[in-house]
Amino acid sequence: MPAPRPGTPVRGSTTGRPLMAAMDLFGRRWALRILWELRAGPLGARALLARCEGLSSSVLYQRLRELTASGIISPSADGYELTRLGTALGHALRPLDEWATTWAQEQEPEQEPEQEPEPEQELDDQEPTET
């Protein structure tokens, strides 16, 4: 599947809106994790595989191609690194991260108010039963 491009239909949208293309790209397995790992500096494929437990090399190379074609990362002497657009993306995602934290807190199950315990009757207050 080719990298999503603004102006063309993408999964879930035929409008070609840039936001929809970006959401399609970032919604692909491991895409955001790869970008997260590159935030501190360049990494090679082996380092990315080691940091992303469960990521297969075929999916890694597919995502690297898509992110490179989209101008978000670029090959470097040390592997792959964020471009100017990739760095700007990190800054743009901070408000979404803050929103997601608030959302997660509001998703915590509400605790039911504690109910008053039933008053216990003392044994002396009970009527005797016949046996």
Locations of the language-model features?
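N-terminal helix-turn-helix DNA-binding core of bacterial DNA-binding proteins
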Residues: G12-V59, R65, S70-I72, Y80-T87
